[in-house]
Amino acid sequence: PADLSALSRRMSDRHFGIGADGIVVIMPSDHCDFRMRMFNADGTEAEMCGNASRCIGKYVYDKGLTSKTQLTLETLAGIKHLILDVKNGTVNRVSVDMGNPILFVPKIPVNTSLSEIISYPLEIENNTFNITCVSMGNPHTVIFLNEMERYDLHHIGALIEHHELFPKRTNVEFVEILSPDHLKMRVWERGTGETLACGTGACASLVAAVLNGKANRKAVLHLLGGNLDIEWNEKNDRVYMTGEAVTVFEGEWNNNI
């Protein structure tokens, strides 16, 4: 269908649709193996989605659309490189080169005269949170908390997502440092709300943790939906994400209903 935004809203609805954080469309590309478009549950289009890119890698290989185990994927955030870990004829894990983190404020973007936002105090309803802003092709605002269960993350996340600082809104990551190589993360996604995982958010969280002296350049991110291995390579400044990709179910959608 031409209106992918409306389709995403219908399919993502947990009462009248399938129920999802959004939809991912796999398309042909003129200069990559495949092209992806990602639409959030509210119908807005995202630049890319790290977790969706892993799902695409599994889908195209398992469905026989490619026999390659190294793929290029065209996204609105640039070309992403995927490495597929294949066992017994199916993809088990996928590693994605997520590219270089963007810290320059106009490129994120953030409404401020500062060039970078690292541990910047932001007041939200009489509470001050130190935020670090990173783009992984889409905007992220990372906040470090101790005992994050004490906070109403849905309320805070929504307020920050729509804060006047962020002209294109922002994803919000709440991170608790368990150790320098183990981080606990919850995410409030722009246009969707809290989700079980966010690949670009996990990458942004590790970058922010390193910038604030809280983590090593390689760490495990513990999310509600599972774990992701994230590395910010010091030599080439690129961030790499590795995680599982699992088929949950298959079905057909009647768009005439």
Stretches with model-predicted labels:
Residues 1-90, 141-257:
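A glycine-rich beta-to-alpha transition motif near the start of alpha/beta enzyme domains, typified by
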Residues 71-73, 117-124, 134, 219-221:
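Short acidic-hydrophobic surface loop/beta-edge motif
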Residues 82, 128-133:
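Short, surface-exposed loop motifs enriched in S/T, G, D/E and P with embedded aromatic residues
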Residues 93-95, 99-101:
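Membrane helix-loop-helix hairpins that form the core translocation module of multi-pass transporters
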Residues 100-102, 136-140, 245:
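Glycine-rich beta-alpha junction loops
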Residues 102-130:
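Active-site glycine-rich loop that binds ribose-phosphate moieties when present
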Residues 131, 139-142:
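Selected transmembrane alpha-helices and immediately adjacent juxtamembrane segments
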Residues 134-136, 158:
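Membrane-interfacial helix-loop segments of redox and metal-homeostasis proteins
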